[in-house]
């Protein structure tokens, strides 16, 4: 690990020198690429420098204890030695995490798809609440949310909704939200006070770019039509809505949120590219998970990831056994504590896998 860290420091210094050269500064694309690489390496370099400082402090403290007879100086050296050893242990853990292979999609924007599951109208209402939860969370982070398509019910529910979240590292954070979310509560129409269980599914997909997915024109059918609102009512007098059909996969994309046919077509193709890219990612991840299962006997993914219990004001994430009693705050977008815990658990699992493979 330490040989690799020394190589990274050397490379980091080379990057800093390159970024100061006029030729590089005048080449916008190259400058941007090198700046990104430099900013990715900076946390590793800074942590490793602190680690080396602490190691040096340990050596200095041991030397004082070996040579110094003054009791006050020896006590100070013992305290410094204790603190430095604790810091070295923490910094070594941090370095191992920083050196974990990075998901190449982590920096991408995301497209989120929420679909109401079991539970009828109550499931649609829950899907709408989960949608608003993510919108609030994204807005609190200064991210931009753009609705791509929504199938709304007449009383505020959503049978389905697809939206894009644009922001730095959006996929690295929101990818942990994929899975089935479950709600337990008494519906307003329930006269006996019985608790009903409903579900909605959440799929978080990294936005695919043209370079990620190539779509052949002959594989696509494009239909244009007038946009419609709830109950099929016409909301546009021009053929602005667009429907794409991808023959090889059977995927159908419908976009009508924009007034312009061109904009709806762009949104539809963006969503299609992302879904095709996600299919490829899922195939790869399933193959890797199967390989992991054969190696260490783990890797199964539970379908139900989280329960929102209204009578108890409780939210439980079943993947990490985390329970929080702040349901209202969470539904208002306060999900950072859950996400941080998921990230920590994921990092711990990856470290364990690396140590096992080694």
Curated annotation (Swiss-Prot):
GO molecular function, a single term: translation release factor activity, codon specific
GO CC aspect terms: cytoplasm
Keyword field: Cytoplasm, Methylation, Protein biosynthesis
InterPro entries: PCRF, Pep_chain_release_fac_I, Pep_chain_release_fac_I_sf, Prokaryotic/Mito_RF, RF-1
Location of the protein in the cell: Cytoplasm
Gene3D superfamilies: 3.30.160.20, 3.30.70.1660, 6.10.140.1950
Keyword Cytoplasm (UniProt): yes
Post-translational modification: Methylated by PrmC. Methylation increases the termination efficiency of RF1.
Presence of keyword Isomerase: no
NCBIfam families registered for this protein in UniProt: prfA, PRK00591.1
Similarity comment: family membership: Belongs to the prokaryotic/mitochondrial release factor family.
Function: Peptide chain release factor 1 directs the termination of translation in response to the peptide chain termination codons UAG and UAA.
Protein's UniProt name: Peptide chain release factor 1
Taxonomic source organism: Agathobacter rectalis (strain ATCC 33656 / DSM 3377 / JCM 17463 / KCTC 5835 / VPI 0990)
């Amino acid at each position: 690990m330490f040989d690799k860290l020394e190589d990274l420091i050397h490379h980091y210094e080379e990057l800093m020198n390159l970024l100061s050269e006029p030729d590089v500064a005048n080449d916008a694309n190259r400058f941007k690429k090198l700046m990104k690489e430099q900013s990715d390496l900076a946390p590793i370099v800074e942590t490793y420098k602190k680690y080396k400082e602490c190691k040096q402090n340990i050596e200095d403290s041991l030397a004082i204890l070996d040579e110094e007879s003054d009791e006050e100086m020896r006590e100070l050296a013992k305290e410094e030695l204790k603190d430095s050893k604790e810091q070295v242990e923490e910094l070594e853990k941090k370095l191992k995490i920083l050196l974990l292979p990075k998901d190449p999609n982590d920096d991408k924007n995301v497209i989120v798809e929420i679909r109401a599951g079991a539970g009828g109208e109550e499931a649609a209402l829950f899907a709408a609440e989960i949608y608003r939860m993510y919108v609030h969370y994204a807005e609190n982070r200064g991210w931009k949310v753009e609705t791509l398509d929504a199938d709304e019910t007449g009383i505020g529910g959503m049978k389905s909704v697809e939206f894009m979240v644009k922001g730095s590292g959006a996929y690295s954070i929101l990818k942990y939200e994929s899975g089935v979310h479950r709600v337990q509560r008494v519906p307003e129409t329930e006269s006996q006070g019985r608790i009903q269980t409903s579900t909605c599914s959440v799929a978080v997909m990294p936005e695919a770019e043209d370079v990620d997915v190539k779509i052949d024109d002959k594989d696509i059918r494009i239909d244009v039509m007038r946009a419609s609102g709830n109950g099929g009512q016409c909301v546009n007098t021009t053929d602005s809505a667009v429907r794409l059909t991808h023959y090889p996969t059977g995927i159908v994309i419908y976009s009508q949120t924009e007034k312009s046919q061109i904009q709806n077509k762009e949104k539809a193709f963006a969503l299609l590219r992302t879904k095709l890219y996600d299919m490829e990612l899922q195939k790869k991840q399933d193959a890797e998970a199967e390989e992991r299962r054969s190696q260490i006997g783990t890797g199964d993914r539970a379908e139900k990831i989280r329960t929102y219990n209204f009578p108890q004001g409780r939210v439980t994430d079943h993947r990490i056994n985390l329970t929080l009693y702040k349901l209202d705050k969470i539904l208002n977008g306060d999900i950072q504590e859950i996400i941080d815990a998921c990230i920590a658990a994921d990092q711990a699992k990856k470290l364990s896998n690396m140590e096992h493979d080694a």
